[in-house]
Amino acid sequence: MWGLRFIQLLLGLCLFGLGAALMVRAHLGLDPWNVFHQGMSSLTGLSLGMISILSGVAVMLLWIPLRQKPGLGTIANIVVIGLSMDLFLVLIAEADGMGLRITYMVVGLVLTGLGTAAYIGAGMGTGPRDGLMIGLNRKFGWSIRVSRMLVELVVLAGGWLLGGVAGVGTVAFALLIGPLVQFFLPAFQEPWRVKTPPV
């Protein structure tokens, strides 16, 4: 059972990386964290995936004063998403024409929601950024929604100022990722009967 959950976790994280790579190739806007990662990548010359990994480690260090404990899923989230994103960015060609760019964005968004549901449903630990929201909730009593909004507004603004791409894809992500995860989650959650909070 543990092995199957771990496989589901890895598949979910790879799907997330694939979805993120497609949204990068669409050039129509990324989710807030990847806008930040893209901006930092432009600034430093490091790959998007490597910046994602370093960012994940930095965010996880913020767990220490919040007394959050990482799980196996937390570590896997940091490493697998970053590596898979870099791999898929090598394999996926640039979109030629607006029709293909929109297709990349839509498919990327759906795969990101599917991947998120898969790794959450495996119940093996939150990602570093989700864990930060939970820690802020426990430490200061802020709602997870408010915590997420504040943190993502900061990273979005910072990433955009550094040259990250924000646009219609960013808005679509903000509006649709929650409903997509909620739609896919039961299929991945039920086999293990893992109780996870709603997105």
Which sequence ranges carry the predicted segments?
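Core subunits and conserved enzymes of cellular information-processing
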Residues: 1-199
